[in-house]
């Protein structure tokens, strides 16, 4: 088990509560935006990589309806167990423990793919992007939601302050300070928007659009095969 995998096993029971508190509920809006930008029709097939407790997965299921098919994949068992408990009303969802770098499906299986706050945590970002490209049908779209690099130095300073002075102390209240302390260095190591878009194009995608949120504190990047 990797360090990141073990981290998500530990934080799973409180992950959603902390997301609500730390984003003031805005993560729900951003996840819905990511799903909407895929423009999936009813009956479509979709994949949610690094699905965690399944917020995005369930939004995809609502989008494609009961005639569609959605797979939620994560490498950690604990968040998947929570996701399964919450999916009684979503028979179109299949939950799967697996690796985002080697997804066990044939090429051109899915019409849409989401990955929310997951690409930053994989050990090989280019390989994850190549897998998304492989799995999509021609014309299919992938939506990547994650922290990003702010557009101004003032916002970057705010981002660092917010993470170190609000996020980590809030997590400390739940005994998870060490688990959330990794966020700031992980964001610093994440590709900048131009680099990320270039990596997506190198993976084979033809159209890439980057949408900064809150001045670039967060972003959704949409790529079409």
UniProtKB/Swiss-Prot annotation:
GO MF annotations in UniProt: 2-phytyl-1,4-naphthoquinone methyltransferase activity
UniProt KW keywords: Methyltransferase, S-adenosyl-L-methionine, Transferase
InterPro entries: MenG, SAM-dependent_MTases_sf, UbiE/COQ5_MeTrFase, UbiE/COQ5_MeTrFase_CS
Pathway: Cofactor biosynthesis; phylloquinone biosynthesis
Pfam families according to UniProt: Ubie_methyltran (PF01209)
GO biological process: methylation; phylloquinone biosynthetic process
EC number: 2.1.1.329
Enzymatic reactions: demethylphylloquinol + S-adenosyl-L-methionine = phylloquinol + S-adenosyl-L-homocysteine + H(+)
Enzyme class, first EC level, given as a word: transferase
NCBIfam families reported for this sequence: MenG_MenH_UbiE, PRK00216.1-5
The protein's role, per its UniProt record: Methyltransferase required for the conversion of 2-phytyl-1,4-beta-naphthoquinol to phylloquinol.
Family of this protein: Belongs to the class I-like SAM-binding methyltransferase superfamily. MenG/UbiE family.
Identification of the protein by name: 2-phytyl-1,4-naphtoquinone methyltransferase
Protein's gene: menG
């Amino acid at each position: 088990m990797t360090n990141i995998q073990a981290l998500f096993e530990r934080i799973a029971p409180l992950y959603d509560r902390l997301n609500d508190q730390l984003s003031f509920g805005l993560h729900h809006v951003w996840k819905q935006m990511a799903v909407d930008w895929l423009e999936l029709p009813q009956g479509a097939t979709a994949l949610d990589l690094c699905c965690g407790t399944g917020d995005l997965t369930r939004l995809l299921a609502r989008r494609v309806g009961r005639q569609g098919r959605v797979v939620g994949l994560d490498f950690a068992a604990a968040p998947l167990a929570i996701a399964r408990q919450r999916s009684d009303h979503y028979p179109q969802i299949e939950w799967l423990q697996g690796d985002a770098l080697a997804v066990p499906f044939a090429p051109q299986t899915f019409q849409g793919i989401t990955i929310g706050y997951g690409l930053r945590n994989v050990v090989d970002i280019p390989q994850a992007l190549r897998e998304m490209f492989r799995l999509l049908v021609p014309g299919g779209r992938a939506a990547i939601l994650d922290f990003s690099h702010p557009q101004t130095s003032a916002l970057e300073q705010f981002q660092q302050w917010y993470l170190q002075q609000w996020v980590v102390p809030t997590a400390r209240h739940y005994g998870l300070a060490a688990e959330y302390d990794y966020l700031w260095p992980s964001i610093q190591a994440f590709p900048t928007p131009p680099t990320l878009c270039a990596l997506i194009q190198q993976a084979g995608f033809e159209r890439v659009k980057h949408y900064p949120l809150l001045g670039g504190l967060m972003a959704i990047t949409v790529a079409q095969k």
